């Protein structure tokens, strides 16, 4: 629990530590020293989310697991007790009033940790989850933005790959425009030629009609000129006789 609190406090204080006057040059110098090479492209192993197990709030579990095959289950405790007694018997460590103060302080801290550690840990975990959620949201937004950029780039590449279709369409449009112009000119020529042929046909028909009229008038005039007065009288008399005969036949027929 204390490790989570320390990590959270360190993360919150990191920007201020970078700008600190005393630690800034040292940190920058260390950065210059340890980050002069090329970055490694090897995959970075994921950091553990939770710390390892400890006993008595201080001694790691790996220490006991290391001594179990050699000393048995009680070996680490016997070793610790013997080490404490050795330090006291040889007066390497002398018990003073400060020792009782330290024991009281440690006991009070242990009590605080046992009583409020879980709630403080949950609060720290909640803060970390909120920060992780914010970072995840920023990450997803960045991923979406990058994906949109990738999709746009793919669409642009697809348009570039299909630009020959555009050239083909333009080429076909130009060919169609040329074909339409050619057809229009051809139709204009056809209309002009037809008009001229119609004119010549009209002229020929008119000349033929005039020739026929002139021939008829000439023949009629010659026929009239060739008839004598005696022939005219005989023809008129014959016509009158024919009319009288026709009238008599009409009167002789019974009325139905």
Curated annotation (Swiss-Prot):
Residues bearing N6-acetyllysine are: 139, 154, 162, 221, 233, 244
Q: What is its main location?
A: mitochondrion
Record-level GO cellular component terms: mitochondrial inner membrane; mitochondrion; proton-transporting ATP synthase complex
Q: Which residues carry this modification: N6-succinyllysine?
A: 131
Which keywords accompany this UniProt record? Acetylation, CF(0), Hydrogen ion transport, Ion transport, Membrane, Mitochondrion, Mitochondrion inner membrane, Transit peptide, Transport
Against InterPro entries, the record matches this protein to: ATP_synth_Bsub_B/MI25, ATP_synth_F0_suB
Q: Any idea which GO molecular function terms this record carries?
A: proton transmembrane transporter activity
Q: Which GO terms describe its biological process?
A: proton motive force-driven ATP synthesis
Q: Where is the transit peptide?
A: 1-42
**Any idea where this protein resides?**
Mitochondrion; Mitochondrion inner membrane
Subunit-level organization: Component of the ATP synthase complex composed at least of ATP5F1A/subunit alpha, ATP5F1B/subunit beta, ATP5MC1/subunit c (homooctomer), MT-ATP6/subunit a, MT-ATP8/subunit 8, ATP5ME/subunit e, ATP5MF/subunit f, ATP5MG/subunit g, ATP5MK/subunit k, ATP5MJ/subunit j, ATP5F1C/subunit gamma, ATP5F1D/subunit delta, ATP5F1E/subunit epsilon, ATP5PF/subunit F6, ATP5PB/subunit b, ATP5PD/subunit d, ATP5PO/subunit OSCP.
Q: What does this protein do?
A: Subunit b, of the mitochondrial membrane ATP synthase complex (F(1)F(0) ATP synthase or Complex V) that produces ATP from ADP in the presence of a proton gradient across the membrane which is generated by electron transport complexes of the respiratory chain. ATP synthase complex consist of a soluble F(1) head domain - the catalytic core - and a membrane F(1) domain - the membrane proton channel. These two domains are linked by a central stalk rotating inside the F(1) region and a stationary peripheral stalk.
So what family is this one in? Belongs to the eukaryotic ATPase B chain family.
Q: PANTHER family this protein is in?
A: ATP SYNTHASE F(0) COMPLEX SUBUNIT B1, MITOCHONDRIAL (PTHR12733:SF3), MITOCHONDRIAL ATP SYNTHASE B CHAIN (PTHR12733)
Q: What is this protein called?
A: ATP synthase peripheral stalk subunit b, mitochondrial
Name its species: Bos taurus
